[in-house]
Amino acid sequence: RTSSSAASDVYKRQYLNKVGIGEKWNAFPSELSGGQQQRAAIARALCMEPSALLFDEPTSALDPELEQEVIKVIKDLALEGRTMIIVTHDMKLAADVSNHVVFLHQGLIEEEGSPNSLFKSPKSERLQKFLSSTRAA
C-alpha cells in the first residue's frame, strides 16, 4: 500500500514485529522454522488489512513449542477484536479464542453456539463422542 521501498520496509517490519519475528525481516523462507513461516504468513495477510482472517489448521504440522508461538499470535489477534475463521481440530484453541463455534461433520453443520455451550454441554451425540476422544488424547 506504500510506494517507496523504505516505507514498504517499515510497513513490513511493523507486521513482522507484531507476530514476533521482526528480526527475521530479511530472511528467506528456508531460513525460518515452521512456526516462523506460519507467523510470516500471518504478517503478510495482516499487510492487506483484511476485514477477516481465515486459518486452516494453523498449528497442525508444528511441534508443540512452535505451535505455542502461533497460538499466541492468534490469541493476540483475538484480543484485538479481529474477525477470524479458524478451521481446527484443536478444541483448546477453539475454546480459547472463539466467541462462536461451528462443529461440522461430513461437511454439514452438526452443532453451533458459544464455546461454553458447545464444550460444556454438547447436544449432538457426534460432538459428544468427538470431545470425549480429544479429551482422552
Language model features with spans:
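Conserved ABC ATPase signature
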Residues: 28-32, 36
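A short, proline-enriched helix->beta-strand linker immediately N-terminal to the Walker B motif
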Residues: 47-51
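Catalytic Walker B motif of ABC-type/P-loop ATPase nucleotide-binding domains
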Residues: 53-56
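A short, surface-exposed alpha-helical micro-motif characterized by mixed small hydrophobic
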Residues: 94-96
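ABC ATPase "signature
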Residues: 112-113
